[in-house]
Swiss-Prot record:
InterPro entries (alphabetical): GreA/GreB_C_sf, TF_GreA/GreB_CS, Tscrpt_elong_fac_GreA, Tscrpt_elong_fac_GreA/B, Tscrpt_elong_fac_GreA/B_C, Tscrpt_elong_fac_GreA/B_fam, Tscrpt_elong_fac_GreA/B_N, Tscrpt_elong_fac_GreA/B_N_sf
Record organism: Buchnera aphidicola subsp. Cinara cedri (strain Cc)
Keyword tags: DNA-binding, Transcription, Transcription regulation
Origin superkingdom: Bacteria
One Gene Ontology molecular-function label: DNA binding
Function in brief: Necessary for efficient RNA polymerase transcription elongation past template-encoded arresting sites. The arresting sites in DNA have the property of trapping a certain fraction of elongating RNA polymerases that pass through, resulting in locked ternary complexes. Cleavage of the nascent transcript by cleavage factors such as GreA or GreB allows the resumption of elongation from the new 3'terminus. GreA releases sequences of 2 to 3 nucleotides.
rRNA-binding recorded as keyword: no
Family: Belongs to the GreA/GreB family.
SUPFAM superfamilies according to UniProt: FKBP-like, GreA transcript cleavage protein, N-terminal domain
Protein name: Transcription elongation factor GreA
């Protein structure tokens, strides 16, 4: 049974772009590197050859992984979901940490799209689990290694 993988259209397109790069740029370069390394002689002690083969293995595995994810992708367009006013997958949520008054803005995305530097958090993260289904001005508690942290939901956007 194939489990669907929730992702945004942006995440789906990002994976498609990576797949295209791997297939049409990276893979041909690796094939050339293997051919060049073969010309250097004995393959048993040819570091360039073994390095290129290892890179080829990584590339082929990543291609298979991406193709599988794209096949199982369930693209969720939150602009077409009538759940306005509550936090759902794909929402961009502004929260205020009660103890510090720091403001954070997070977008809830699929596992493959999560990027903490871009404040995109996985649907399976503790923060997302605390946010899903909540409304503006709700107080949430997020379990962290140092204890619970309380936040107030200040804004919910569906971008």
């Amino acid at each position: 049974m194939f489990n669907k993988i929730p992702m945004t259209l942006r995440g789906f397109n990002k994976l498609k772009s990576e797949l295209k790069k791997l297939k049409y740029i990276t893979r041909p370069c690796i094939v050339k590197a293997i051919a060049n390394a073969r010309q250097l002689g004995d393959l048993k002690e040819n570091a360039e050859y073994h390095s290129a083969r290892e890179e080829q293995s990584f590339c082929e595995n990543r291609i298979c992984e991406i193709e599988n994810k794209l096949l199982r992708a369930q693209i969720i367009d939150i602009t077409k979901i009538p759940f306005k006013g509550i936090v759902i997958f794909g929402s961009t949520v502004t929260v205020l940490q009660i103890s510090t008054s720091n403001i954070f803005v997070y977008t809830i995305v699929g596992d493959d799209e999560a990027n903490y530097k871009e404040f995109s958090i996985s649907i399976h993260s503790p923060m997302s689990r605390a946010l899903i289904g909540k409304k503006k001005n709700d107080i949430i508690k997020v379990n962290t290694p140092t204890g619970y942290i309380k936040y107030i939901i200040k804004k919910i956007e569906y971008i």
